[in-house]
Amino acid sequence: MIEILENKNNETDKNLKSITLKNSNEKIAEIKIANTFFSRLMGLMFKKNGKVQVLFEIPEKINKKERSSIHSFFMRFEIVLVFIDKSNAVYEISELKPWNYYVPKKPAKYIVEFDRREFNDCLKIGDEIEIK
């Protein structure tokens, strides 16, 4: 079981809520939540590195019409995309080079965007995510 814990103070970005992704023993990643149109649009674009990862909350109305596609335009590094379904399970993991586009196999409830250099196989297909 992977837990997502809300952080009380957000030092990484004053405009985005920060959470910590952890398993039972250790912190996996510091994650920003992208839950507005603009924050979902920006993701990790224009960043020099991906020391802080991004969790996209996909609105249900988008999920019904589209397939939670992701692009890496204006990215300076490769990313790993982790797709989480409505039962909070990781169902797909994909790598994406800069200036590419990816459409997952099915709609996602959440997508986590990692800098590939920071990912370290910290999540696997079938992992269940618990948000606290």
Spans of model-derived segments:
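Compact, glycine-rich, soluble single-domain proteins
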Residues: 2-132
